[in-house]
């Protein structure tokens, strides 16, 4: 009898210990606020995708849009020109969202090893998408001269090293970001400040000084050295945006704009218009992206918050967000020798832009016919067409 009582007490102690551990784990998770949910992530990716299409299609200097009628001039103000300049921030937006999303994804893991496993899986998944799309577009590219049928071209395309289709350059950058991601996230995980704005301001100041150095360094000579130099500073732009995304997740900056208090509405309005004014008026030249990493969270977080509160808009941007990777890889083929004659049918700039969205979305659905079952199989879900009309959720 006494032995039975002792066994029961021992079992109760184990249950209590397990329950206490579980409660402590839950408390740790709850202590890390996450105002930027998966729902917000899909909306933000949708916003970034549509900015990407607009900037690439309607920016000044493109030869393929010279025949588009610019109906977006109001009282002498060229809305098309300045909106295309502002939407240049889309490239930094992708790096920002990568940092924010990876922080939420990797912070739950305990070891660097587990973090790298997750990163490798993410990159392999992205390459699967890339290869499937490459198979679809390569035959047409041979006819139009975009690709050549030789070993060097094929190998460079397979590994996204170099290729005339410039939209693939982000593959190299994303790989580099994944290499550094676990280290940065582990570092930020252990840093704790009562005043969250102090480390943010210090970080911005250091990055801004480093970025300005480029204006005073001139590299000439070997083309490989020049290429590596440009690659380094391009990567610097995106590693900064990536780190800003980590900071936004670490300090829950989204809560500033999702707060139920009335002040959050005014913060959002001020932040959006300030970012537009700075990008379009204070930055000299469309290609000068020295402070885009500063502007991206000022615009992307509040605009995402606004959209999330409207059912129709949130559904639309969520749909685009689920196809964001396909959008990145596919949209360029409609204005780069592939189907420019089809894209130009509406004649007017805004209609051509809407038409590009429709064409890219239809193409993404077609790609997903092959892509979805492959990714499901890789994820040990078997071949099925569940989610046929949606991009695979991470």
Question: Which residues make up each language-model segment?
Answer:
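Interfacial loop-to-helix transition and helix-capping segments at the boundaries
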Residues: 79-92, 158-173, 212-243, 277-300, ...
């Amino acid at each position: 009898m006494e032995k039975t009582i002792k066994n029961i007490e021992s079992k109760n102690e184990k249950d209590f210990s397990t329950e206490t551990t579980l409660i402590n784990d839950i408390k740790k998770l709850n202590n890390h606020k996450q105002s930027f949910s998966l729902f917000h992530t899909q909306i933000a990716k949708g916003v970034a995708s549509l900015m990407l299409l607009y900037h690439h299609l309607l920016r000044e200097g493109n030869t393929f849009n010279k025949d588009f009628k610019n109906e977006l001039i109001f009282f002498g103000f060229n809305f098309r020109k300045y909106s295309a300049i502002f939407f240049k921030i889309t490239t930094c937006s992708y790096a920002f969202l990568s940092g924010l999303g990876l922080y939420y994804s990797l912070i739950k893991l305990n070891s660097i090893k587990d973090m790298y496993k997750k990163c490798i899986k993410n990159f392999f998944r992205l390459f699967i998408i890339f290869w499937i799309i490459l198979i679809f577009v390569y035959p047409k590219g041979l006819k139009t001269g975009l690709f050549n049928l030789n070993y060097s071209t094929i190998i460079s395309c397979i590994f996204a090293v170099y290729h005339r289709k410039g939209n693939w350059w982000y593959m190299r950058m994303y790989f580099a970001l994944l290499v550094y991601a676990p280290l940065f996230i582990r570092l930020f995980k252990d840093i704790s400040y009562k005043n969250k704005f102090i480390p943010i301001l210090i970080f911005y100041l250091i990055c801004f000084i480093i970025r300005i150095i480029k204006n005073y360094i001139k590299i000439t000579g070997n083309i490989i050295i020049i290429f590596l130099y440009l690659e380094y500073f391009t990567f610097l732009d995106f590693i900064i945006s990536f780190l800003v995304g980590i900071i936004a997740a670490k300090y829950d900056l989204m809560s500033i704009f999702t707060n139920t208090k009335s002040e959050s509405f005014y913060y959002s309005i001020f932040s959006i218009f300030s970012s537009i004014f700075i990008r379009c008026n204070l930055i000299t030249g469309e290609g000068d992206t020295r402070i885009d990493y500063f502007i991206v969270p000022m615009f992307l977080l509040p605009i995402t918050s606004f959209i999330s509160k409207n059912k129709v808009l949130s559904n639309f941007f969520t749909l685009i967000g689920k196809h964001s990777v396909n959008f990145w890889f596919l949209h360029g083929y409609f204005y780069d020798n592939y189907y420019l004659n089809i894209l130009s049918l509406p004649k007017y700039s805004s209609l051509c832009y809407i038409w590009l969205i429709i064409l890219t979305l239809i193409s993404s659905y077609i790609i997903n016919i092959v892509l979805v079952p492959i990714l499901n199989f890789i994820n040990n879900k078997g071949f099925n067409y569940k989610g046929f009309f949606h991009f695979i959720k991470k």
